[in-house]
Amino acid sequence: MKAYKPPVVNKFGVISSTYHEELLKSIFESSNRRKSQKPKPSFSISKEFILRFNHTDNPAEEEELLEQARRLIVRSKRKLGLKTLGSGKHVHLPTAWAEVIYLAQCKGEIQDEALNMLHASLDHVSFDHDQLPALFFLAESVLYRLCCDAFMKGYLYSVEIKLVKIGYLIFLRLFVFFLHGHLESFKQHLLRLQPYLYALHFSEPSYYKYPNIISNVQFILKTSEIICKRELHSEPFVESPDETEDPYSDLNHLQLNKRGYEVNHLLWHSVAAWSCVQNNRPQLTEVLEHLLFYKTQLQTKCWLDSALALMVLGEAAKLDMACLKTLMDLVTDFLENILSAQNQEENYNIYDTSWASEIVFTYTTIIAEVCLYAATSDLRKTALIGFCACKSPQQGISLTDKSEELPELDGASILTLLKYFSSRISDNCEKVIWIGYYGIVYNLVKMSWELQGEQDQDGLRNMIWQTLQKIKDYEQDPRIRCALVIAQAELNGPSDPFCTKATPNSGEEVFSKYIGWRIATTLSRLFFPSLDVAPPKTPVEVDLPRKHTIRERQPAKKRVLRFILKDHSSVVEVSMTPYPNFFTKADKKLEEIIDHHWQKDMEARKREEEAYKAQNQKDKEEKEKIHFQEIMKQRERKLNKQTKPYEIILSEKESGSEKKCGFFELKPSTAPNAK
């Protein structure tokens, strides 16, 4: 068989082999050189960009970098999905979170905008275990900023408050993932967080004057303590060699072993109540009765589950009056028992006030959110003034008269707690009293700011404004006046140590509007799986390892309470439907638009029918007129008369007398026989 040899084409002419190799080598190097010298895209965030942005002195370059940073902010907003609650094909949260935390290192308005975007995103996005690496990166970045930048300053700044609020949302999400058992493969990430948590623990006393910050800091430390003790199987990262008693000894009774973390009954029943409200289940009354039966669990020093229970029950209270009453009854009973125990001074130590004040401050935030975002006006009014029948709620508030007859605690509404705490505030009062008073005043300022521009709620805003004016005029306690200053500074955005210029940002989210709903939805799916995800009743062989099957079923056996699963098995079978999302609202809006156009079409048809009837009437009258004219023509032709039938013709005498009387003159008849 002949071998085919293609012809050799020499593109370089007749040259030597050595020169040919050198020519090919130079062409290859030049092509690689052009690729390596390709500039980076202008939209990339790098260390050089941040350094140039923060240290440039050239006004032209500063304006150019600021414009580029604004374009980066717009791109990050789209990736975060701030307008769609973190959903959509264009959303990529891990990348967007990393970009935003990098942009937060820039000075001025870019830093404020980036932190506000990150806080809003962490508030409203749904829970997905693919977010865990990015969440740990955010946690490490925020803790680093707090420990290495914020703690070095001698004053409190708005950026520091925002960082603490963002850290609270991050660790709240990590704790929910911990309840699902998703943190088992992130031990290395937890170890990297421990030095920063250790520094945060020792800087905690610097925040004791600010309950709004110390509340978030204590939540971060408590959450990390439980997660690290469970996942790392070691002692707590905080140890006090000078003290014989462990400040976190209340964790020793928890069953933090391989079988998982056991939630208390209060949290379980709160999630059950929320599920009943969401699905309109008739078992709501019985669930609330059982929830009140476990109200003593709110008084345990392991308060993390209690805080989550109040948060979930607060979400149910935004939709149902019975849940709101149960929430108020829980807190009223809690305050009465805690204050009576402190007055007796039995078994009282420094850690009791810490966890009790944490519960009280958490409740003040929850009841403020209910007052703002409840579904009906009755719920909002009840959250503000309680279940009283008084006509004017302002009559019940008196901040000037602190007489010996102190009012009793008859509810847990905002104004009721304000009246109760203000009558008992003093220099040596219990920590729960002044922190509760601080929380009420702090949230009232934020509520007044949130209601700006809401014309439908002018009455609520006026009542809050009048209450704040009374507090400003008559309250002399420096801790309460500090609450007014801190809240106003947080909303107005003063200067901070991380930037040379700061502008107030009106787009900042004052309250975390969605995180409670997200947590309630996720926990309801964990505690009460729907039929499509629940394992079948008949044994079916599944190609999964046995260890994985046991790990899924064992926590459910520990968390399940008998009264629901045994007596009311239908609770497990309900499908958990979340609040209307963006697409549901869009469909509803489209339906309204279609209905509007249908109404316009009906009105147009009605106008056409009326015009058609009017035209028919006009044509009918025209036909009658033509018919009458034809009759008159026939009469004139036959009788030679132009008078109408039965028309009377006057004689000349009668016509003359009528002229004398002043009547109009009539034309003489044209009939031939007329005289």
UniProtKB/Swiss-Prot annotation:
Keywords: Cilium biogenesis/degradation, Coiled coil, Membrane, Transmembrane, Transmembrane helix. It is found in: Membrane. The chain crosses the membrane at residues 163-183. High expression in the testis and weak expression levels in the spleen, liver, brain, uterus, lung, epididymis and kidney. Not detected in the heart or ovary. It comes from the Eukaryota. GO terms for cellular component: membrane; outer dense fiber. Its main location: membrane. Disruption phenotype: Deficient mice are viable and display no apparent abnormalities. However male mice are infertile. Mice display an abnormal sperm flagellum morphology. Furthermore, mice have low sperm motility and decreased total sperm count. The sperm flagella of deficient mice have abnormalities in the cytoplasm removal and the flagella axoneme lacks microtubule doublet 7 and the corresponding ODF. GO terms for biological process: cell projection organization; flagellated sperm motility; maintenance of protein complex location; spermatid cytoplasm removal during spermiation of flagellated sperm; spermatogenesis. Pfam families: TMEM232. It is a single-pass membrane protein. Residues 598-634 form a coiled coil. InterPro entries: TMEM232. Residues 605-624 are annotated as: Disordered. Plays a critical role for male fertility and sperm motility by regulating sperm cytoplasm removal and maintaining axoneme integrity. This is Transmembrane protein 232. It comes from Mus musculus. The lineage of its organism: Eukaryota, Metazoa, Chordata, Craniata, Vertebrata. The gene is Tmem232.
